[in-house]
């Protein structure tokens, strides 16, 4: 527990700082934007790129006998650094540009949401293909009660292929030998396309409500707080799961199927909701169907709570399913 303490202390500080800046802004209409910023940060912890990067780095450092406790935290700090810097720059730039382009706020908000939604759908579909391949291997190993060397190599190839940015920056992992070395990798991940669209949303929110500089700073800080909390918890869970999951090949593939399935679901679910909400709003669509009307009015704050609860249930369900149905294959 002592090894985790400095990281969780830093996370508590980020939460306190973000909330303090938010309350100092003294603008109740800004609370929704702050909730959205926190949820967007938390959402990233469940992105396929984040999961794959943290997973691969922890696996590498653990196999080398090195301390991997700070991987999730330093990765999120690298990613958040881009968001903090660019949100501040973008907010000031947008405030200036809005005087010359009155439609910028509306157009930018729509474009940002569309880009984010489409990107999530693409990532979700790419990882769904990988998930199908993992399930095929698991089915074969389930029937044969073992994994061949070729199947193990195929699993490794699939796991390192999860996430678009993870594929692109894969060579950088060779230079990571300590937890803090993942910070620049996280920074590069922060330059990704989906992050750019979210920066635009945060900047537009602060500019639209005409909040003070203090309030504007609360958005990227809360974004960083949400991301660092769940990325660090992700790393903690993976370190614990590593001891359990990688003792046998079957556990390894089952664990990664569970993780990949969750990342596919969240990418497709949030992407579809983002696109559905912006399209229905612009077309002024009204739905009598209860489900569609609920999705249309669903707040991202509520969505964040639902997703966190869903992940807890899914992880527990996955663990007990293994114990009940598949653990006998290890004997």
From Swiss-Prot:
The chain crosses the membrane at residues 3-23, 77-97, 110-130, 184-204, 213-233, 259-279, 302-322. GO terms for cellular component: plasma membrane. The keyword Phosphoprotein does not apply. It is found in: Cell inner membrane. InterPro entries: Ni/Co_transpt, Ni/Co_transpt_high_affinity. It holds the Pfam family NicO. The keyword Transmembrane helix applies. It is a multi-pass membrane protein. GO terms for molecular function: nickel cation transmembrane transporter activity. It comes from the Bacteria. Keywords: Cell inner membrane, Cell membrane, Membrane, Nickel, Transmembrane, Transmembrane helix, Transport. High-affinity nickel intake protein. Imports nickel ions in an energy-dependent fashion. Necessary for the expression of catalytically active urease. PANTHER family: HIGH-AFFINITY NICKEL TRANSPORT PROTEIN NIC1. Belongs to the NiCoT transporter (TC 2.A.52) family. This is High-affinity nickel-transport protein NixA. The lineage of its organism: Bacteria, Pseudomonadati, Campylobacterota, Epsilonproteobacteria, Campylobacterales. The gene is nixA.
């Amino acid at each position: 527990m002592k090894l985790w303490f400095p990281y969780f202390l830093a996370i508590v500080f980020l939460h306190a700082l973000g909330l303090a800046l938010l309350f100092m802004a003294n603008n109740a209409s800004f609370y929704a934007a702050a909730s959205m910023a926190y949820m967007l940060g938390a959402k990233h912890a469940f992105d396929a790129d984040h999961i794959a990067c943290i997973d691969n780095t922890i696996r590498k450092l653990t196999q080398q006998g090195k301390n991997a406790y700070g991987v999730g935290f330093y990765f999120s700090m690298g990613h958040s650094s881009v968001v903090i810097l660019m949100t501040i720059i973008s907010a000031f730039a947008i405030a200036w540009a809005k005087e010359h382009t009155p439609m910028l706020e509306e157009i930018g908000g729509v474009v940002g949401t569309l880009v984010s939604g489409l990107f999530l759908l693409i990532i979700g579909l790419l990882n769904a293909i990988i998930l199908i391949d993992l399930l095929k291997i698991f089915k074969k190993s389930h029937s044969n009660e073992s994994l061949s060397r070729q199947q193990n190599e195929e699993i490794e190839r699939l796991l390192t292929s999860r996430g678009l940015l993870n594929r692109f920056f894969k060579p950088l992992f060779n230079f990571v030998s300590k937890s803090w070395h993942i910070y620049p990798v996280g920074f590069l991940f922060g330059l990704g396309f989906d992050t750019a669209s979210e920066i635009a949303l945060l900047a537009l929110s602060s500019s639209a409500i005409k909040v003070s500089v203090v309030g504007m700073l609360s958005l990227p800080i809360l974004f960083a707080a949400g991301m660092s909390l769940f990325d660090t918890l992700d790393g903690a869970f993976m370190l614990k799961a590593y001891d359990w999951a990688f003792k046998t090949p079957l556990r390894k593939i089952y664990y990664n199927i569970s993780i990949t399935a969750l990342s596919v679901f969240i990418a497709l679910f949030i992407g579809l909701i983002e696109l559905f909400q912006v399209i229905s709003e612009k077309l002024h669509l009204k739905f009598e169907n209860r489900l569609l009307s609920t999705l249309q009015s669903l707040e991202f704050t509520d969505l964040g709570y639902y997703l966190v609860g869903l992940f807890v249930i899914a992880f527990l369900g996955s663990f007990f399913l293994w114990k009940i149905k598949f653990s006998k294959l290890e004997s």
